UniProtKB/Swiss-Prot annotation:
Functional description taken from the UniProt entry: Specifically methylates the N7 position of a guanine in 16S rRNA.
Residues involved in S-adenosyl-L-methionine binding: G78, F83, A129, E130, R148
Keyword Magnesium applies: no
Compartments, record wording: Cytoplasm
Organism: Clostridium kluyveri (strain ATCC 8527 / DSM 555 / NBRC 12016 / NCIMB 10680 / K1)
PANTHER family from the UniProt entry: S-ADENOSYL-L-METHIONINE-DEPENDENT METHYLTRANSFERASES SUPERFAMILY PROTEIN (PTHR31760:SF0)
Gene Ontology annotations for the cellular component aspect, listed alphabetically: cytosol
Name of the protein in its database record: Ribosomal RNA small subunit methyltransferase G
Family label: Belongs to the methyltransferase superfamily. RNA methyltransferase RsmG family.
Family matches, as HAMAP family: 16SrRNA_methyltr_G
Record has Cytoplasm as a keyword: yes
Record Gene3D superfamilies: Vaccinia Virus protein VP39
Keywords in alphabetical order: Cytoplasm, Methyltransferase, rRNA processing, S-adenosyl-L-methionine, Transferase
């Protein structure tokens, strides 16, 4: 089975449209990622097959959360090399996408990808999550927030929940053992105006992890997120 067939099968299983044009964008994205990775550390995953399975398909499987298909605006917080945001955009080109990262060199890379594979309505922002969440143009202004960033769920929730509209969702891509994090984060999520709605298992020969789905129930207090550095050093309890 070639790469197109692998990705097409995954998309069909999720009820998603996949075609040659979308596939070509993924392949060009892969090539740009490998080229830039020689100059800066974007990913430790460099084999073509692994990039497709561990980055692209892993990102596409966020669509196991079905309401994502109806989202009109998505922000990817701590996007790194563009995962899962850019694969989501390729699959769902009509969505408005914001890619947020704290390293400017990554933003330069992302802007190059967006230009090269001709993605429309994508904004790449250089900034810290806790700072940008206080700006009126981003705060409580997105249907869905996604993040594959490596951070404790309590910390990640304070970074991400302020970006969501009331009634919207935060999808945290977490590893296979997430029970303790969920237990520890419930009060913080409640303080921030959210509620854990679902935990979706993502499992096959390559994957074993969870999508933690948090729904925004009420507005986030202006107290949150707290200033840069405090969120990680003193997590909400």
């Amino acid at each position: 089975m070639d790469y197109f067939e692998i990705m097409d099968t995954v998309c069909k299983d999720l009820g998603l449209n996949f075609n040659q044009e979308k596939y070509n964008k993924f392949i060009k994205y892969k090539d740009i990622l490998k080229l830039w990775n020689d100059k800066m550390n974007l990913t430790a995953i460099v084999d073509d097959k692994d990039i497709i399975k561990k980055h692209f398909i892993d990102s596409i499987r966020v669509f196991k959360f079905l309401p994502l298909k109806d989202a009109k605006s998505i922000i990817d917080v701590g996007t790194g090399a563009g995962f899962p945001g850019i694969p989501i955009k390729i699959i769902k080109p009509e969505v408005k996408l914001i890619l947020l990262d704290s390293l400017n060199k990554r933003i330069k890379f992302l802007n190059q990808v967006v230009l090269s594979i001709k993605l429309n309505d994508v904004t790449c922002i250089h900034g810290r999550a806790e700072d940008c969440a206080r700006k009126i143009e981003y705060r409580e202004n997105n249907d869905v927030v996604v993040s594959r960033a490596v951070a404790n769920l309590t910390v990640l929730s304070e970074f991400c929940i302020p970006y969501i509209k009331v009634g919207g969702y935060f999808i945290a891509m977490k590893g296979p053992s997430v029970e303790d994090e969920i237990t520890e984060s419930k009060n913080a999520i409640n303080i921030l105006g959210g509620k854990i709605e679902d935990i979706i298992k993502v499992e096959d020969d390559e994957f074993n992890h969870n999508l933690v789905v948090i729904k925004k129930i009420t507005h986030t207090s202006d107290k949150y997120p707290r200033k840069a550095g405090i969120v990680s050093k003193n997590p909400l309890r």
